[in-house]
């Protein structure tokens, strides 16, 4: 038996960083323009009124208001931002 480990023993020590995906602002919460609402991979949630979609499918608020989650048609889920009235 070898008393020293063979080369390559530390091959499996790498790990990727966490993505921190999920809903960041829930329904009924107040958000400012530019606030991230959902971090996701793919379009589990689709952008609705006053909501934009980033290149990595992140949904963000385009206007100040209240977050609202809704279902439309089949199983498609939308996220809207209802503007606050001054």
Curated annotation (Swiss-Prot):
GO terms for molecular function: structural constituent of ribosome. The keyword Ribosomal protein applies. Residues 1-24 are annotated as: Disordered. This is Large ribosomal subunit protein bL27. Pfam families: Ribosomal_L27. Belongs to the bacterial ribosomal protein bL27 family. It comes from the Bacteria. Keywords: Ribonucleoprotein, Ribosomal protein. PROSITE patterns: RIBOSOMAL_L27 (PS00831). It comes from Salinibacter ruber (strain DSM 13855 / M31). GO terms for biological process: translation. The keyword tRNA-binding does not apply. Residues 9-19 have a biased composition (Polar residues). InterPro entries: Ribosomal_bL27 (IPR001684), Ribosomal_bL27_CS (IPR018261). GO terms for cellular component: cytosolic large ribosomal subunit.
């Amino acid at each position: 038996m070898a008393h020293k480990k063979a080369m390559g023993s530390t091959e499996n020590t790498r790990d990727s960083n966490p993505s921190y995906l999920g809903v960041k602002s829930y329904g009924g919460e107040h958000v400012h323009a530019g606030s991230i609402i959902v971090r996701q991979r793919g379009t589990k949630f689709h952008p609705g009124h006053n909501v934009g979609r980033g290149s990595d499918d992140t949904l963000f608020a385009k206007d100040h208001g209240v977050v609202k989650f809704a279902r439309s048609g089949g199983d498609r889920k939308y996220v809207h931002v209802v503007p606050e009235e001054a």
